[in-house]
Amino acid sequence: ADAIKAGLDLDCGPFLAIHTEAAVRRGLVSQLEINWALANTMTVQMRLGMFDGEPSAHQYGNLGPRDVCTPAHQQLALEAARQGIVLLENRGRSLPLSTRRHRTVAVIGPNSDVTVTMIGNYAGVACGYTTPLQGIGRYTRTIHQAGCTDVHCNGNQLFGAAEAAARQADATVLVMGLDQSIEAEFVDRAGLLLPGHQQELVSRVARASRGPTILVLMSGGPIDVTFAKNDPRISAIIWVGYPGQAGGTAIANVLFGTANPGGKLPMTWYPQNYVTHLPMTDMAMRADPARGYPGRTYRFYIGPVVFPFGLGLSYTTFAHNLAHGPTLVSVPLTSLKATANSTMLSKTVRVSHPDCNALSPLDVHVDVKNTGSMDGTHTLLVFTSPPDGKWASSKQLMGFHKIHIATGSEKRVRIAVHVCKHLSVVDRFGIRRIPLGEHKLQIGDLSHHVSLQTNLGEIKV
């Protein structure tokens, strides 16, 4: 009842269908409010043309599987999988592998030959699958051992065969991680570690491997793989998400250097003990050290991480150079009240007080050069950090720019910083404010500082 009264018009599950009638009988919601929800839903359907006669006569009425599985769409699925792969660790430039030096590769793990797992949830029928094993097999000879019967990995009976495969191969690829039996809608994870005996399998195979050991992680959420990060025998770590129908091809392309990884982590990877300090019932974002609460997300969390939000390595290297950027900006105020509320004591102004429309975006120009030996795609992340304040986040992502740069080439990126939008923060009371003083822009490995001050514009009384 509360949800409908608050404006929820549509429930894609059965909850409203089951409980709404009883809510009306008890007087918790009126029939008029139900009618409004129905009218809003049907209005959208009408705007979409769903009541405009025979569906097959509409512009998209005859689309079917043959339209989904065109070569262009299948290529798009492959490209999306490639771009989504994140290289987290690459010791001694172990990757990419070489078809000349790594003629036999052991492919091990419960996700090494999966199909539907790669699709994740909320997906249609795939046009076809290429598993990681099949993808790697297009480059080199493979020796396959699952190691575990599934991702739950409840026993270690198959570990001996996996170790034997690693001893015979020139390189070993472990494809581990999760699936929808562990993380999905209505399914909560028990922790952040690899399930069951997966960690034991990884460590034992890494000890047995005579060549580089590559850990490929398939999951939707973060995994605490501190053990692998700290194990020098594990040469590289890759996260592939749930890469879709072409996942196996994309993984192999990255492993053997046909594609250069350029993805970035879309979330922070926390250590396992993080969840012990984070009650499910507490959704506060800001950290509270007094009660041992670590905070949520890269914006507020204080503590160690396995891998930070935005991390993503490449097979090439990029250099950044600040070509242009303002250092001092005046924020015009437009009311006497704003002037009174924007003293040096408060050190902030409400976003509603400046004339935001009169503020042109701040232009920051950065030159990005590919200084390595391989063409690559680089995602330039731009973070802002406000002046110190208890109400402020440590940093926030204001934007990103994705550019493909050939080896030895350089491109200029223009970053438009909107003061009211990008340099404002929300305080504890939900009020958006612009902190005065020195703001830091973190652009790749560059830092640039912009100082904000106020000035009195045209007064509106």
UniProtKB/Swiss-Prot annotation:
<dbReference type="GO" id="GO:0045493">
    <property type="term" value="P:xylan catabolic process"/>
</dbReference>
<dbReference type="GO" id="GO:0016798">
    <property type="term" value="F:hydrolase activity, acting on glycosyl bonds"/>
</dbReference>
<dbReference type="InterPro" id="IPR044993">
    <property type="entry name" value="BXL"/>
</dbReference>
<dbReference type="Pfam" id="PF14310">
    <property type="entry name" value="Fn3-like"/>
</dbReference>
<dbReference type="InterPro" id="IPR002772">
    <property type="entry name" value="Glyco_hydro_3_C"/>
</dbReference>
<comment type="similarity">
    <text>Belongs to the glycosyl hydrolase 3 family.</text>
</comment>
<dbReference type="InterPro" id="IPR026891">
    <property type="entry name" value="Fn3-like"/>
</dbReference>
<dbReference type="InterPro" id="IPR013783">
    <property type="entry name" value="Ig-like_fold"/>
</dbReference>
<keyword id="KW-0326">Glycosidase</keyword>
<dbReference type="GO" id="GO:0009044">
    <property type="term" value="F:xylan 1,4-beta-xylosidase activity"/>
</dbReference>
<dbReference type="InterPro" id="IPR036881">
    <property type="entry name" value="Glyco_hydro_3_C_sf"/>
</dbReference>
<dbReference type="InterPro" id="IPR017853">
    <property type="entry name" value="Glycoside_hydrolase_SF"/>
</dbReference>
<protein>
    <recommendedName>
        <fullName>Putative beta-D-xylosidase</fullName>
        <ecNumber>3.2.1.-</ecNumber>
    </recommendedName>
</protein>
<comment type="function">
    <text>May be involved in cell wall metabolism, related to senescence.</text>
</comment>
<dbReference type="Pfam" id="PF01915">
    <property type="entry name" value="Glyco_hydro_3_C"/>
</dbReference>
<keyword id="KW-0378">Hydrolase</keyword>
<dbReference type="InterPro" id="IPR036962">
    <property type="entry name" value="Glyco_hydro_3_N_sf"/>
</dbReference>
